[in-house]
Each structure stands twice: as C-alpha cells, then as structure tokens.
Design a protein with these regions (language model features):
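C-terminal-biased regions
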Residues: 6, 80-86, 105, 141, ...
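Flexible low-complexity loop/turn motifs enriched in small/helix-breaking residues
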Residues: 91-95, 151-164
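Short, cysteine-centered beta-strand-loop-beta hairpins and adjacent loop/turn segments enriched
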Residues: 105-114
Length: 164
C-alpha cells in the first residue's frame, strides 16, 4: 500500500467518524425542531428505533412520524432538548456501531431537568447513494436496571453479523 493509499484510508476513516457524529447529534436537533424530513433522513427505509420502556418503531416514516405525535408536540411546546453525548464509534467497512448516552432535558417550573437518561446503541451502514444511515437504534433507560449498563459495556463490539 502506497503512502497515498494509506493517507486516503486514514482520511476516509476520519470523514466516516465525523459523518457518524453528525448523524447521532443531528437527531436531537431534528426531533426538537419537529422536522419530520430531517428525522427520516437519518434512518434507513426499514430502520428500527427500539425504546425499551416506550415502543419499537419500524420504518423511516413511522420513526419520523414521532415529530407529529401529540405527546411529542406537547413536550416541545413546554420546552425540551433531546441530546446525545459524543458517541464511541466502531467502524467495520461499510457498517458501524455508535454507543452513547442520550437524554431528554425538559423545562419545569423550577428550571430545566433531565427527564430521561438512556444508554443508546446505533447500528449504521453506508448507503450506496452515499452517507450513513441508522439501521437499528436501541435505547435502555439508565434507571438502575441491568439492560442499560450492559448495552454500554458493549461499546467496543463492532456491528452484529449480517443475517441473510
């Protein structure tokens, strides 16, 4: 491998990492802005968003549709922010996993407070048309149960094997 090939591979790795960071943090801005199109663009057409104590949403349209739900609109109307910490990313070719904390901060009479704190694991893939999208996102509340810490403990595990 030539020095130029090595440099190109390193640059691509950095670009992939930055693109995944943008994707992970972009969800909060899009969902708080009730931007259905932007939320949808983050997910593969058959993407899944599984929130352990809430619901499993399947398909880009269903996931993006959360921005139009009454409960979400009420939360946004009171003042809230969906935030992600900087993810730990493992890239394996055209597939990747990002592990992070996510939280919902909401406005309350006494000021702002964390309403939800979750462990999140996102499985992503590079799409043929370019860019990365979320194939599967799993959240577990960090409420003292075992599932959240167990998910975070897997941070160095790469993407799950593809199933036929």
């Amino acid at each position: 491998m030539s020095n130029l090939d090595i440099l190109e591979a390193r640059l691509r790795a950095v670009e992939d990492q930055l693109a995944i960071y943008q994707l992970v943090c972009g969800y909060g801005y899009a969902v708080d802005g009730c931007n259905t199109q932007a939320v949808g663009s983050l997910y593969a057409p058959d993407g899944v968003y599984a929130v352990a104590d809430f619901a499993t949403m399947e398909g880009r349209e269903r996931i993006a549709g959360i921005t139009n739900e009454e409960g979400h609109r009420t939360l946004v109307g009171r003042g809230c922010g969906h935030m992600s910490t900087l993810p730990y990313v493992v890239i394996d070719g055209d597939r990747a996993v990002a592990t992070c904390h996510t939280m919902v901060v909401e406005h309350r009479a006494e000021g702002f407070g964390v309403a939800r704190l979750s462990a999140s694991r996102l499985q992503l893939s590079r799409k043929p048309e370019g860019g990365w999208q979320i194939d599967h996102r799993q959240n577990f509340m960090l409420d003292g149960g075992a599932a959240g810490p167990a998910l975070l403990a897997r941070l160095q595990q790469g993407p799950a094997p593809l199933t036929p």
